[in-house]
């Protein structure tokens, strides 16, 4: 049955049967064991089903159209003058809604009598823009009615009750609920701008070991580094918790070396890399999660100047520029994946000054030279995602490209040489460094104009420790582990291994 219907008697929708309504009044009772289709073929919300008697749900389905936004959003609606009982599944199709913060919610079902019936969304939630809507009972004078609300009902996924037997209740004072997908978009844009970011010692290890054959002429060398890292971050007022694992491979080599005054040294080289990251965002307010994936490449140039080529003390300046391109994906439970790309340039200028702080002998014939090296670095991060519209109609625009990251720190290390290594060119250099890192922008995503941003990463403290070693005149190795800590639960831990071969 379909169309505008007025009936004075009762109506029973049997299993396997459907009642399609536009503006319908049932003078008696309605039992639903099949499907009551509220949404019209044209898709425009506004249909009303009025039941003058009682409504009984026999595990039937009701479908509604709604333009999901604030409290006054257009929607299909059922008005029951009598009582409700039984269980009913509800499907809501969003028709052009961009999402918004609700107060009381969008009224879907109005009940005049005893409201003992239970209504639950078939998918648990419905999404629009950055917001997640649930179906919940009202409070106070509206406690009999059912609303679509983007407010948190106070229940976490870990202890979510059966919505049929324990229906949630709308609290107008509760905070809004954001989609977990927001955390995945944020993680991807942050990774696109930082995966290939590095420092001079990340790329070449200890400069004292650079060009160990330069006394015999201009040396050639190739280097490679591997990085693995794990990041934890939060977004959306702390309700979205993201963990991400990454891998980076970079390699390169010098194109040219020269001196301008027989004391300094210039290096010009090329480099390229591959990286990927997989993130998982879990909401503490809704029971589904989101996965983010990014993988891509970079290629570019680097240039380095050392004031004192003989022992690499004094000042140094290092710079690099990379073009980066990535493929991105965001997917979530029972929702279609969103694939998009990102492109852009990252560039850095780093400077420091190395001075010898002292020399002492160890107990077993080791000669140790202590160095201190203050450092400063500015990195411009210009990788941008392509603005696009998801299949569900949500407009996606990420923010944070153009971030300027500033690093100030100090590194101290010991250059150790044991007397049994005389004539073997073998040296080891343990070190520790501490840094303060500032980001000028917050990585964020706008979903239909609503911004959700990463938290706790504007200012970071970092500690690194590692060892650098010259195995022989041809081979150098280096490795380190480091931890960055921010506020609001932000942390990043990584390990790196590098190798360079000269000939």
What residue spans do the PLM features occupy?
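Extracellular beta-solenoid/beta-roll
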Residues: 1-83, 87, 93-94, 98-152, ...
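Primarily extracellular Gram-negative trimeric autotransporter adhesin
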Residues: 2-10, 18-29, 53-55, 143-203, ...
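Short secondary-structure subsegments characteristic of cysteine-rich extracellular domains
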Residues: 99-115, 238-257, 395-403
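Extended hydrophobic secondary-structure segments that form protein cores and membrane-embedded regions
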Residues: 107-109, 222-223, 267-274, 317-321, ...
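Outer membrane beta-barrel translocator domains of Type V secretion systems
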Residues: 163-363, 480-482, 487-494, 500
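Outer membrane beta-barrel transmembrane domains
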Residues: 300, 375, 382, 391-503
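Structured binding elements
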Residues: 386
């Amino acid at each position: 049955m379909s169309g505008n219907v007025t009936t004075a008697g009762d109506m029973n929708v049997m299993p396997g049967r459907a009642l399609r309504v536009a503006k319908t009044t049932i003078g008696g009772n309605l039992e639903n064991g099949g499907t009551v289709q509220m949404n019209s073929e044209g898709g425009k919300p506004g249909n009303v089903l009025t039941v003058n008697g009682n409504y009984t749900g026999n595990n039937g389905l009701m479908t509604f159209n709604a333009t999901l936004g604030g409290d006054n959003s257009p929607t299909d609606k059922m008005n029951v003058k009598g009582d409700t009982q039984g269980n009913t599944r509800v499907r809501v199709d969003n028709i052009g809604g961009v999402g918004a913060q609700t107060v009381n919610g969008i009224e879907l079902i109005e009940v005049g009598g005893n409201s003992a019936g239970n209504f639950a969304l078939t998918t648990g939630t419905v999404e629009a823009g950055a917001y997640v809507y649930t179906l919940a009972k009202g409070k106070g004078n509206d406690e009999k009615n059912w609303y679509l609300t983007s407010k948190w009902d106070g229940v976490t996924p870990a202890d979510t009750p059966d919505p049929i037997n324990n229906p949630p209740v709308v609290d107008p004072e509760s905070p809004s609920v954001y989609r977990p997908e927001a955390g995945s978009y944020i993680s991807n844009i942050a990774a696109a701008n930082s995966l290939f970011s590095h420092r001079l010692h990340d790329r070449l290890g200890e400069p004292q070991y650079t060009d160990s054959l330069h006394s015999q002429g201009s040396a050639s060398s190739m280097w490679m580094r591997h990085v693995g890292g794990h990041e934890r971050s939060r977004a959306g007022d702390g309700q979205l918790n993201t963990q991400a694992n990454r891998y980076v491979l970079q390699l390169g080599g010098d194109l040219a070396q020269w001196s301008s005054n027989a004391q300094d040294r210039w290096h010009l080289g090329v480099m390229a890399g591959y990286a990927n990251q997989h993130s998982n965002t879990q909401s503490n307010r809704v029971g589904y999660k989101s996965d983010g994936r990014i993988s891509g490449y970079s290629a570019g140039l680097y240039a380095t100047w050392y004031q004192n080529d003989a022992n690499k003390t004094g000042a140094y300046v290092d710079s690099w520029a990379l073009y980066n391109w990535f493929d991105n994906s965001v997917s979530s439970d029972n929702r279609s994946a969103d694939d998009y790309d990102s492109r852009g340039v990252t560039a850095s200028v780093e400077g420091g000054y190395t001075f010898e702080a002292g020399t002492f002998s160890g107990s077993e014939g080791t000669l140790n030279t202590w160095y201190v090296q203050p450092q400063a670095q500015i990195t411009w991060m210009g990788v941008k995602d392509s603005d696009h519209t998801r299949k569900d109609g949500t407009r996606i625009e990420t923010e944070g490209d153009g971030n300027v990251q500033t690093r100030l720190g100090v590194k101290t290390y010991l250059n150790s040489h044991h007397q049994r290594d005389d004539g073997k060119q073998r040296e080891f250099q343990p070190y520790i460094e501490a840094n303060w890192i500032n980001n000028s922008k917050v990585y964020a995503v706008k979903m239909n104009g609503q911004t959700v941003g990463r938290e706790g990463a504007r200012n970071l403290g970092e500690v690194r420790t590692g060892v650098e070693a010259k195995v022989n005149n041809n081979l150098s190795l280096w490795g380190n582990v480091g931890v960055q800590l921010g506020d609001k639960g932000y942390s990043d831990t990584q390990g790196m291994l590098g190798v360079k071969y000269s000939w």
